[in-house]
Design a protein with these regions (language model features):
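An N-cap/entry alpha-helix motif that binds or orients negatively charged groups
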Residues: 1-40
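Alpha/beta enzyme core
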Residues: 3, 9, 48-106
Length: 106
């Protein structure tokens, strides 16, 4: 899998034979079960992604990742709240040290 940032991509306007921009697909297959209509994942920062952002990302085809800057129970509650709001796929940041195993299991 290739990872890129904004510095790695340059879009140069050119002539195109497409009939309509609506005929293009921006969808992206994350794995066998998850396809994003819009290949954008929100940052798992406490000031960025909680339930409302996860819902907005899903509404527009992206993916929200709930931040880990709270207790394990609070994070699990936020994920459940997003699911109850209708978000079928929501992520949860777990980190790589500390309570990451407990978060992954919650």
């Amino acid at each position: 899998m290739t990872s890129m940032s904004f510095d790695d991509v340059l879009l140069v306007p050119q002539y195109s034979d497409i009939d309509s921009r609506k005929s293009l697909s921006t969808s992206n297959q994350l794995d066998d079960n998850i396809t994003l209509g819009l290949p954008i994942i929100s940052s798992p920062m406490d000031t960025v992604t909680e339930v409302d952002m996860a819902f907005a990302m899903d509404t527009h085809g992206g993916l929200g990742i709930i931040h880990r800057y709270n207790t394990v129970n609070d994070q699990a509650r936020l994920v459940k709240k997003a699911k109850l709001k209708g978000v079928p796929v929501v992520g949860a940041a777990i980190g790589v040290t500390g309570d990451f195993l407990e978060r992954a299991q919650a």
